[in-house]
């Protein structure tokens, strides 16, 4: 009982810590999300309004290699948060240990996929402790360099979308090459704004230079968005897991207390029964008293 109480106190403390971290992470996600959405919508609209455009960022390179930026956590005790993100990679037949390299953000995911045989091309696990745009830029610079050199043909991002403390959604997003038809469909869903009324965009000096400037920022923004969302999701999942663990500990303590009290009551009853039996056995009978 004492060990369960001790565990319950630990999980309750972890729940409170995660709750504080979650509030901070939620603020960061809410403040940053409009920028990520605006960046995505700008690129979607730009490609949609540019007519036929040929650019390396819009076309698959000659390499069949795939790069996956996998965002998990450095700590466990977060329910299925880490395993659900890892499964998006390991259960997808498109990503084999031969054709996929992993850029790991988070030791839990890194260790899991490494055991599965995937190559870890980069380890940025410290970036998830406190998401910074500088860390996202560093990761983006590395994968973009490999893409432009033709060493990898596709770049994917696996992260977890934060909905609320009860719901976190593991998600895979393709970063490059940008699929013009898909992103054009997204552009059609963008709310009416001045850019939607433009039928065609002209670039000076050239569309290629415009994309060379904006696509790296686009990739970095999506990576940073993934870091921020995943950080909030991790703390939400951990808070929920610790809340469940605390409730289970309290339920177990209640059950153990009931069993303990019943056992104690049975023991006392047994002792009283034995005492009474002993007294009855040793006390003289009425016949003995008359004699």
Where are the language model's segments positioned?
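Single conserved hydrophobic/aromatic residue that forms the stacking wall/gate
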Residues: 281-291
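C-terminal beta-strand-loop-alpha-helix "lid" module of Rossmann-like NAD(P)-dependent dehydrogenases
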Residues: 1-283
